[in-house]
């Protein structure tokens, strides 16, 4: 009997473990996030297939961000430290993408949407010094998860990877954050981000909604259910909520 178990049960278990380990090696996400997400082998295979699709596209088109930066959000921000989640759409398609939503490197000009974000932080925090660069790494290191809902894009074609399969993965991340953490602040700017509100448990998290910070949205006179981004007060509300629940507020300064 023991021999039969060894051949037909234990050996299969070992094979399954080996296969799952191989899948893990193909997913360049911080191990802390892999442990946190607890993806099934099926979901891991699904993600690996998506990564292989993106890798194939890179052979014939320019894809942003670079392969090594797609999951940089996972390396700058540990899952158990997350306290604010800011959702973006897809990465910058002009070459500035860093893997963090809205962020650019210190050598790139600050994009218009990020300039408006800085204006709103200034209105919320008198101690905020408007930076000359748009690198948001300091926010990420404090537990601000800057997550695009689509993690790659073709050069010059916004939204070009929206149907590749990223949305199921980032929805899964949002759901895990909502389920496993307590008293986080989710900032949802624009209709695409606001669609994610249904994934978040509002009984234990604060969900803040506004129009998108882009200048186009700021100038628009179209009726909206949501307030304009400029004047929304999200950064002040976020820190007040964090302090109310015994968490350190975010220092929004970048330098």
From Swiss-Prot:
GO CC terms in record: host cell nucleus
Lineage: Viruses, Duplodnaviria, Heunggongvirae, Peploviricota, Herviviricetes
Highest taxon, organism lineage: Viruses
Protein name, entry field: Uracil-DNA glycosylase
Family designation: Belongs to the uracil-DNA glycosylase (UDG) superfamily. UNG family.
PROSITE patterns linked to this entry: U_DNA_GLYCOSYLASE (PS00130)
Pfam families: UDG (PF03167)
Catalytic activity: Hydrolyzes single-stranded DNA or mismatched double-stranded DNA and polynucleotides, releasing free uracil
Subcellular location: Host nucleus
């Amino acid at each position: 009997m023991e021999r039969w178990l060894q051949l037909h049960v234990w050996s299969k278990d070992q094979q399954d473990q080996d296969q799952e380990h191989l899948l893990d090696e193909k997913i360049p996400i911080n191990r802390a996030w892999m442990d946190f997400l607890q993806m099934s082998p099926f979901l891991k295979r699904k993600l690996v297939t998506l990564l292989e699709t993106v890798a194939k596209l890179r052979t014939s088109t320019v894809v942003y961000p670079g392969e090594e930066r797609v999951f940089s959000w996972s390396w700058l921000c540990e899952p158990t430290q997350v306290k604010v989640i800011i959702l973006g759409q897809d990465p910058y398609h002009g070459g500035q993408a860093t893997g963090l939503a809205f962020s650019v490197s210190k050598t790139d000009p600050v994009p218009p949407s990020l300039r408006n974000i800085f204006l709103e932080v200034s209105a919320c925090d008198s101690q905020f010094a408007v930076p000359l660069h748009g690198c948001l790494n300091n926010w990420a290191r404090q537990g601000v998860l800057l997550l695009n809902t689509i993690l790659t894009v073709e050069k010059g074609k916004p939204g070009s990877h929206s149907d590749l399969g990223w949305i199921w993965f980032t929805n899964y991340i949002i759901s895990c954050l909502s389920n496993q953490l307590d008293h986080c602040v989710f900032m949802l700017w624009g209709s695409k981000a606001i669609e994610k509100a249904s994934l978040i448990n509002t009984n234990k998290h604060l969900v803040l909604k506004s129009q998108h910070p882009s200048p186009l949205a700021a100038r628009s006179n179209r009726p909206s259910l949501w307030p304009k981004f400029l004047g929304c007060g999200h950064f002040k509300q976020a820190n007040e909520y964090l302090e109310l629940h015994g968490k350190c507020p975010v220092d929004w300064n970048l330098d």
